[in-house]
Curated annotation (Swiss-Prot):
This is Probable anion transporter 3, chloroplastic. The lineage of its organism: Eukaryota, Viridiplantae, Streptophyta, Embryophyta, Tracheophyta. GO terms for molecular function: phosphate transmembrane transporter activity. Belongs to the major facilitator superfamily. Sodium/anion cotransporter (TC 2.A.1.14) family. GO terms for cellular component: chloroplast membrane; plastid. It is found in: Plastid, Chloroplast membrane.
Length: 512
């Protein structure tokens, strides 16, 4: 709750209105926060502006003679209450609906990744107990990707057709069920474990296309990268939460503890999401007209006003080089990301001989900084676009940072002599890789706004294949060569090659 003192009226519209000059309140106003005093006065948003204080006073005096209440008005993009020279003694703000949407989306992304990480940590005691080799450990780690690869394309098409709300609700419910069944499957048989993890991946495949499509509908262009950055910050924080909580629960409760916890949180999220979110802002019963105008500003065509069209042919999509730039970027991003996600605890334990809890702490630090840097990458992208830089140049700058930085860091990781030094290089690699969120991940909405879910599914399908190869390949490389160095070097040069392709062929202009 904020309190402001006596203020002079702001006569820039058809009424005598008081607008708080507190800079914090003003900033909230520009973001679309609604003042409670505005709701009580039932302010009309359609009033025209008037150039002088006297003009506003004359019109209000005329209204009083007609026994009508003086008009109150809405400043551009924000409602204000009060009237005449009355001071606003107390201002309470109500959170914009789009902020609620991005917070719930970030929570979903946090659960999405935490559920993956639980297995990355729990697999270490399982491997010791069941006698798995490094190569078979890679098979188990990659098993969720077997289902993920199929749901990426299907999930993207479903999101384009039905919207992100319903698809996400079903996806989270099903992957929470699979998470709950994982310890039972591990105790039953290896085959059952692989099947449950594949089903888990099948359900999780809808998360990314749903997130990008939903946020593109709820946020204006100059806020979209920040919204994705916040959601992906939640995604990366899922790594931190999973890496820190899982060892504690494994030691105190057992294998089933962390799986039951995160499955329960997922089902709780579904109940909240289903009752509080709509696919499009104009369908929300809670959104204000001022916030809706702010969202729609700069959007020449709204998704809800477009008649549904069939997805373009795969041949047409693949005939354009910007599509291939996105596909190769997704392949490289997933290759490097899943190597670190699946093998980081194992890396610290085998290379530096630290215990599981210490390995989890060293692994958590890079993901925590990635969550923070991802938000700032999105904010920087939005700032560059607002200040006149072309979307194409911004996407190329962000993606170049997101690939060149990790490539150089992984090469340096080969020379790390202590777990602390290795954690620093991994932190730099993952922090800079988060700039990809403002690169290829947003570029799908740029080149194909009507088919972004379908395009995301296609590129994510290729990226999932790369993740399977890299996750399994790391295990074989380690088993054959006895170290991680060779595979880290291969991954670094893949980052460099994809950066060149991206700079040559990526675009921020609409293609489809």
């Amino acid at each position: 709750m904020a309190t402001v003192g006596s203020l002079k009226p702001l006569h820039h519209s058809s009424c005598s209105s008081s607008f708080p000059r507190n800079p914090i309140v003003n900033r909230k106003a520009l973001l679309g926060f609604v003042f409670d005093s505005a709701r009580k006065n039932q302010i009309r948003c359609e009033n025209l502006r008037y150039s002088s204080e006297s003009d506003g006073k004359r019109r209000n005096a005329a209204a009083k003679k007609r026994n009508q209440s003086p008009e109150r008005c809405a400043a551009e993009g924000v409602l204000t209450g009060g009237g005449g020279s009355e001071a606003i003694a107390e201002v309470r703000t109500m959170m914009p609906e789009r902020i609620k949407v991005v917070i719930l989306t970030a929570c979903m992304m946090c659960l999405c990744n935490a559920d993956r990480v639980v297995m990355s940590v729990a697999v270490v005691p399982l491997a010791d107990k069941l006698g798995w080799s490094s190569s078979f450990l890679g098979v188990v780690q990659s098993s969720f990707l077997w289902g993920y690869i199929f749901s990426s394309v299907i999930g993207g098409a479903l999101v384009d057709r039905y919207g992100g709300k319903r698809v996400l609700a079903w996806g989270v419910a099903l992957w929470s069920l699979a998470t709950l069944l994982t310890p039972w499957a591990a105790a039953h048989s290896t085959l059952a474990l692989l099947c449950v993890r594949a089903f888990f991946g099948l359900a999780e495949g809808v998360a990314m296309p749903s997130m990008t499509t939903l946020l593109s509908r709820w946020f204006p262009m100059d806020e979209r990268a920040s919204a994705v950055g916040i959601s992906m910050a939640g995604f990366h924080m899922g790594n931190v939460v999973g890496l820190l909580l899982t060892p504690l629960m494994l030691s105190s409760i057992g294998i089933s503890g962390p799986f039951i916890l995160f499955a329960s949180l997922g089902l709780l999220w579904v109940s909240t999401w289903s009752s509080g979110v709509t696919n499009n802002p104009q369908d929300s019963p809670f959104i204000t007209r001022s916030e809706l105008r702010l969202i729609q500003a700069g959007k020449p065509v709204q998704p809800s006003t477009i008649s549904p069209k069939p997805n373009p042919s795969l041949r047409l999509l693949l005939s354009k080089l910007p599509t291939w730039a996105i596909i190769f970027a997704n392949v490289t991003n997933n290759w490097g990301y899943f190597v670190l996600l699946s093998w980081m605890p194992v890396y610290f334990q085998t290379v530096f001989n630290v215990n599981l809890k210490q390995a989890a702490w060293f692994s958590a630090l890079p993901w925590a900084t990635m969550a923070i840097s991802g938000y700032y990458a999105g904010a920087a992208s939005d700032f560059l676009i607002r200040t006149g830089h072309s979307v194409t140049s911004v996407r190329k700058i962000m993606q170049s940072i997101g690939f060149m930085g990790p490539g150089l860091s992984l090469l340096c990781l080969n020379f790390a002599k202590s777990p602390s030094c290795a954690a620093v290089f991994m932190t730099i690699a993952l922090s800079l890789s988060s700039f990809s969120q403002a690169g290829f991940l947003l570029n799908m909405q740029d080149i194909a706004p009507q088919y972004a879910g379908f395009l995301h599914g296609i590129s994510n399908c290729a990226g999932t294949l790369a993740a399977i190869v890299s996750t399994i390949g790391t295990g074989y490389f380690v088993q054959w060569l006895g170290s991680f160095q060779a595979f880290l070097t291969v991954t670094a040069f893949l980052y460099f090659a994809t950066t060149v392709f991206w700079l040559l062929f990526a675009t921020g202009e609409r293609v489809f």
